[in-house]
Amino acid sequence: MKDGCTSQKVNKQRSIPLPVLKNPPAQKDEIRSSRSSWWRAAALITLTLLMIAHIIQWRLMGRTISPIEPSEAMYTLQNGAVNAGFIFFTLAILATLIFGRFVCGWGCHILALQDFCAWLLKKFGLTPKPFRSRLLVFVPLIVALYMFVYPTVYRYFAKPKNEPLIPQFTNHLVTSEFWATFPPVFVAIPFLFVCGFMTVYFLGQKGFCTYACPYGGFFSLADKVAPGKIRVTDACNQCGHCTATCTSNVLVHAEVKQYGMVVDPGCMKCMDCVSVCPNDALYFGFGKPAIGVPKTIKKNYSLTWTEEFAAAFVFLASFLAVWDVYQLVPMLMALGIATITTFLAMRTWRLFRVKDLSFYRFNLKSSGGIRQAGWIFLSFALVWLGLNAHSGFVRYHESAGARAFENIKIPDELALARTNPARWLSASDVQNINEGKKHLYTAVNASLLVNSTVLPKLAWIEYLSGNTEQAVNFLAAASEHQQGQAKALSFYYRGAILNRLGRYEQALTSLDQALAEQSDLVLAREERGESLWQLGRKQEAVSAWNDAVQSNDNLVLANNLLAGAAVSLGKSEAAAAYEKQADQFTPADPLFHWVVGLRLQNVGMNALAEKHFGRAIQLNPEFRKARN
């Protein structure tokens, strides 16, 4: 120790302890429950019950108000059939022009299913995350234009000059065929599952509304000019409760801050944001519409621009692959499937491109390695995408075969006049028969389900090819999977072919089945009379032909058959009257005369047959070659 330095004893500590106070419990910034959601749930449940009651009433009484479904408006625009769906859709658009897009939020059964699915997922701790795309949001509008505008535009350019743009309106408010425009029940159930549940799981709440609902395409446009909006007062403190509770995936807090109102056309006026606002700063009111307001809020999207174009391609390919495949998948279901396919394809792409990827609370990939959840997701995605590709393969061959079938020009009446119509087939017909057979057989052999419209086409192609037994078998198989008019026609064609083969008892059974399905099918009555005549039951045959004439006294063949029957039974005056009636409506067409002659010759009415053969040759001497 240096001289002069003395040790000093520190008597006090240099740091002073401060008293520690207990913190008060932190205030929980909880979002209060929405009172509006309960009212909306009640409205949607009531709507669902009314829909069920509507179906029950139709099943019990046989007649009811036509479906209150916007797609029914297509038949009004195309055929002039004014129905309940057209009236509802018109009123809904008009209401949206004033109040905004509230019909979707409070009056749509598909949205009710989506909300129910989201509620279930949250019960399992899974909160649907919105899939945001720049391009796919235009799908609903494009489809709406295709459904409701394109037919009128096409008619404008294609219609004859003397026809009106829109056909004369007729009253179709009441119908006995309530389900005629809907898919079968076994398709409707998976349709509701795909569009009401799966779209929510993969695309977020209201995923179907955002990317697949064509009616929403028009409602979104109407919402832009509607004065009714969710608006804000100065009491807003940007807590974000509104955005957190919005089930339409709208950035409510950001939009009301920037624009003073919600401008996103996806807002369905559910009123949840208004109900949960802690300061009661939000309200529904009228004022300036959203149109013309510059959109300055930058959104975060799920895809890059390169991925956007890839997603658009995948969506289109998937939609075309599944729409109407097996003659079962309706357009709206195809749109729902395509959105899910697009999500799975893009997420699978990312699974191989990025180091880390999650889906809900599951880690699909971490630090470059695919986890167990990732392999499960990948397996599901590959199965789903594989089924899409398979559907596309089947749909291509169905479509190609159908086009070839439609290009076969030989008239049915001529082909059915004899068992072997080969002599009447043109080179073009032969080519289309071969093309149709190739594509339709490929579709049938690859199909996972039965296409009840392909089988009758194959039956007709086989008949024209001379394979009558195969044609009969295909028509029998088709009838097992058909309903209504389609089933009746399969029974009719089967009966007609069996008549030509001389198997009259079987033909009679098939024709009776056709008439049981559709009692006004007069062609089946004509063929039924032929079966009875050939079986020796002549009075019953005359009765069948009389039934046909009573429904339409202009039937040339039926009147000729009655004339021939009257001659056979010794009733010359009646024969002359029937023949005169037939001649009155017989066109000066050689082919028509020839077909009538062949049909009369089939039942042994040779004198009348020769009369028509002679008239055909007189009109066109080339038919003389057919006698040789």
Map each language-model feature to its residues.
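Hydrophobic/aromatic packing residues within the alpha-helices of TPR/SEL1-like helical repeat arrays
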Residues: I433, L440-Y441, L475, L511, ...
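Membrane-interface segments at or immediately adjacent to transmembrane helices
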Residues: A389-E480, Q506
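Non-ligating segments of multi-cofactor redox enzymes
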Residues: K2-K257, S275, D280-A422, N432
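Register position in tetratricopeptide repeats
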Residues: L464, R500, Q534-L535, S568-L569, ...
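Structural marker of alpha-solenoid helical repeat scaffolds
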Residues: A446-S447, H481-Q483, E517, S551, ...
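Helix-start (N-cap) detector for alpha-helical repeat units in TPR-like alpha-solenoids
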Residues: V394, N451-T453, Q485-L489, V522-L523, ...
